[in-house]
Amino acid sequence: MAEPGTPILVAVAWPYASGSRHLGHLAGAYLPADVFARYQRLAGNRVLMVSGSDVHGTPITVRADAEGVTPADIVDRYHAEFLDAWERLAISWDCYTSTGTDNHAAVTHDIFLRLLEKGHIDKRTSEQFYDAEADRFLPDRYIGGTCPHCGYLEARGDQCEDCGRTLDPEELVDPRSKITGATPELRATEHFYLRLSDFTESLGAWLDGREGWRRHVLNFSKGWVEEGLQDRAITRDLDWGVALPVDDLGEGKKIYVWFEAVIGYLSAAKEWAQRSGDPEAWREWWEGDDARSVYFIGKDNIPFHTIIWPAMLTGYGGLNLPTDVPANQYLTFK
């Protein structure tokens, strides 16, 4: 139980601005977070509840392609819909924003450059899937296939929604392009990588010290570390996303969504501070020794919040890691 007056960051999953939210989203992340935030405010704690629309995910470009409109058209439609829904549900945000702001890009660039400077990001040439019929490289969500771990036939190129494992597209069995249905080929391309392997020991020790976490969250996270953390590409061959703060890779590259979306919790806190009239106020929730941070997400986002984001925070230095990540299971109807 937090002492009265404790700064508590309530960090809530960022919905893709690619489609309407459903009951599972509300029950899994948004209503629990709002109940928790309201209780903590009544208990006398200083709550900062933040989230926003994720406007750079490939589900957005996939939908835009299908409808024959621009990604910005899709984003504008669903961001407005989300804002209306939160107002009607009376969700008590302190800051609900989007990853499309100049502020978010600036905070993302700051973290990218610090990690690059400290050697936790490096540049590599790798082979990625290319659709010769469409004449383009394929981001993860533009590829489907069979999960190599559980055999699920409709796995995505970034994750299997059946077993929850994150994937690299080249791991898929019988991969296919979602644009043309063709079998993609591997071609060389240059990208920046986050050296997750640098944090194996520190994250393992941190997870061992977590108390009160939900068992499925802790076991899943520890399993990642025990299997050995793999370095992951953090840029993609895309024209929709946060621009790189360096020009090493040339044209046609963007920071990939899984790297920059989690930074939204920090950029939203900074945006709130700027709006409040004290641009440094965010530090109370992110740097204070007594501060707590609780992340409300669905189970499919566990590794991004218990492995990747803590690794980024550790590498950056001076920012608080999550206190708890009470990820919910999927809501099912029978």
Regions found by a protein language model. Name each.
Residues 2-51, 98, 103-107, 150, ...:
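Structured secondary-structure scaffolds
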Residues 41, 87, 116:
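Anion (oxyanion) recognition and catalysis
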Residues 53-59, 63:
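Short, charge-patterned binding micro-sites
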Residues 63-76:
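A charged helix-plus-loop insertion that forms the helical arch/lid used to bind
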Residues 73-77, 93-106, 132-150:
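Aromatic/His-enriched, Gly/Pro-containing loop or helix-boundary segments
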Residues 79-94:
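A glycine-rich helix N-cap at a beta->alpha junction
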Residues 105-123:
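Hydrophobic or amphipathic alpha-helical targeting/insertion segments
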Residues 119-191:
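Cys/His-rich short segments
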